[in-house]
Amino acid sequence: MNASAFHRLLKTSAPAGLGPGPRSGVEFLAALNRAVDAALKEVTRDKRRSDLVRALILLWHDHLEASHVIAQRYEDDADGSYVHAIVHRREPDYSNAKYWFHRTRQHPAQAILAERAGELLGDDPTLRGVLMPRGKWDAVAFVDACEEAEIGRASCRERVLQVV
């Protein structure tokens, strides 16, 4: 797999915001789709996987509607539901995000998130306790924390939540 192609696609001047954007440094949709086509051609012929990777890259570049359309195609799939939840979290449609996270049950991505987020949250034991009760990632608590940061109740945590 040519990971560097995907790293380039995710390179932006700032992390994605907690809300829908827009922000500077993101690619235009048509150019981004061409770049995603080229990168995916090298790594997989699995349409579902390709589509979901595309949805996540489009979402990273603040193309929420295009990402949402793709995620909706895979609503009955755990990976598709997880992507769908992330899209709704960014919109922000918090209750819908929680619905889709509940549908995914205990998605395998949550173990990876717990490990990586744990490193980032080391300096904030309170937030760590909220997002990772008993050491496991809680996607619904993450949605709640993002909502609180977005409405100004926890602005000091916004940057940490963006990186997570």
Task: Give each language-model segment a name.
Residues D51, S81-H84, H88:
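TPR repeat positional signature
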Residues D93-W100:
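Conserved alpha-helical segments that form or flank metal/cofactor-binding pockets of metalloenzymes
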Residues R54-A55, H84, N96:
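Structural register within alpha-helical repeat arrays
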Residues M1-D77, E91, R103-R159:
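N-terminal alpha-helical interaction modules that lie
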Residues A78-D79, S95:
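Extended hydrophobic/aromatic segments used for targeting, binding, or gating
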Residues V160-V164:
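Hydrophobic alpha-helical segments, chiefly the membrane-spanning helices
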